[in-house]
Amino acid sequence: VSRSRLFGTAGASRKDILAEIAAVLSFSAIINNDKVGALFFSDKVEKFIPPKKGRSHLLHIIREIIEFEPTTDGTDISEALRYLTNAIKKKCTAFLLSDMIDVNEDGSPRYEEALKVAVNRHDLSVIEVYDPRERCIPDVGLVHIKDSESGRSAWVDTSDKKMRRAYEDWFRNVGQLSSKLFMKYNVDKVSIAVDDDYVKGLMTLFQNR
């Protein structure tokens, strides 16, 4: 629930798509008579709803998914994974929904240690939601940009080809490093663009499980 979820240029923000996917997964769990819970995080765990069964519990989760607003702007996936590991003692199926942009300066994921511990206890899958337009910068001249999480801002000359290429290379590197990490720990992952049919992405994820 960090501020980066608000980004969106294709008619729907990442927040909208994340909320819809979370709701679909919750409905599916209730239909299968499974318990369902939710953990909301930014750079800290914002709210934890313990797993339960029942329609009223489902509606409570859906309401929180739609209405919840974080108290801070950052992202710390490690915090969420550590909390999950400690809060749920029995093995469970868990879905991590995020843009997965939580990296070191070299682009490597910051959450490897927490992931390694979590997957030893739980069946974890990753659903990455992204906006394709976020991964490239159009040539539109001098632009003032602001990081939605850190609050830092700067003027950027988007006509600089080297800068645009470096930006795209950075995103590509982040994606490759995260994919290697998930393969290393046998974590199923699907990437869903905000302008794609997320149902197809979810079907692909479940077919591969």
What is each stretch, according to the model?
Residues 1-52, 93, 97-98, 105, ...:
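An amphipathic, basic-hydrophobic helix/alpha-beta surface used to engage anionic
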Residues 5, 65-69, 186-189:
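Short amphipathic alpha-helical interaction patches enriched in hydrophobic/aromatic residues
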Residues 20, 24, 75-82, 176, ...:
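Short, contiguous clusters of charged residues that form electrostatic/catalytic patches at enzyme active sites
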Residues 21, 57, 61, 80, ...:
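Internal, well-ordered alpha-helical segments in soluble enzyme and binding-protein domains
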Residues 48-64, 180, 185, 207-208:
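Short, electropositive alpha-helical surface patch
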Residues 57-92, 104-106, 131-132:
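Von Willebrand factor
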Residues 83-90, 104-209:
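Von Willebrand factor type A / integrin I
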